[in-house]
Amino acid sequence: YMGVVEMYRATGNPRYLELSKNLIDIRGMVENGTDDNQDRIPFRDQYSAMGHAVRANYLYAGVADVYAETGEQQLMKNLTSIWNDIVTRKMYVTGACGALYDGTSPDGTCYEPDSIQKVHQSYGRPYQLPNSTAHNETCANIGNMLFNWRMLEVTGDAKYADLVETCLYNSVLSGIS
């Protein structure tokens, strides 16, 4: 998403912007899609953070780029709701996110043994933020920072800058060894 929008910005070729919009539109079109791959439901129906945290955060950052170019209000509505869900219910004070290393999707389970969706390195249920088993992969935290950076760019709201700083100095910097 982000790379395709950057190609559009660099070349001015509208096919790249169209491709980025199509990549959002295909979310949820896969039969038996999963939270892990961000394709269980259409993006425009998503109002909470779900699934693999790296894929999720990079998707959210890319959607913010598409919003910056198109101004589609539905995308901002989704992004704002997802951001609020992350910040108020699925993020540690360090800015870290993606608490679960391994588990089952809190939303994509049909309660039939062969269709329970497994997730890894993912967002869990609201307030499911364990101490001793927190995964909080560095890549997810970089994605969180990229998502907040783009939200700052499109809104100018300092709350996004605050989280860029929180993530950078805590959950991202700690990944450097």
Label each residue range with its predicted role.
Residues 1-177:
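Glycan-recognition and catalytic cores of secretory/periplasmic carbohydrate-active enzymes
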